[in-house]
Amino acid sequence: MIYPVIDPAGTGSNLRSLIVSSGNSIADVGRMLGIADMSTMYKWLRGDALPGIDNMLSLSIILNVSINDILVTK
């Protein structure tokens, strides 16, 4: 069986869209997550890194979506 893999760039782009659609700014979401260095958020949005599971759960709550709605697979 072949399992899907997470597409970091697609997930980052999707995350950006979800943040904008929620009416929050990227900085607002970063503050809600307690992220001191905003470069972390931008790494996620560019697809250079993925949020850890704790931040992914928090993002799903902040954005009122499921984790599966944030992730893009290929």
Ranges and model annotations:
Residues 1-24:
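A short, Lys/Arg-rich alpha-helix, primarily the initiator
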Residues 16, 27, 57:
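Residues within the helices of the helix-turn-helix
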Residues 19, 30-31, 60:
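The alpha-helix within a helix-turn-helix
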Residues 23-43:
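Short alpha-helical DNA-recognition segment
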Residues 44-45, 74:
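DNA major-groove recognition helix of helix-turn-helix
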Residues 47-58:
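Short, basic-rich loop-to-helix N-cap that marks the start of a DNA-contacting helix
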Residues 64-74:
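Short C-terminal boundary/hinge segments that cap the last helix of small helical domains
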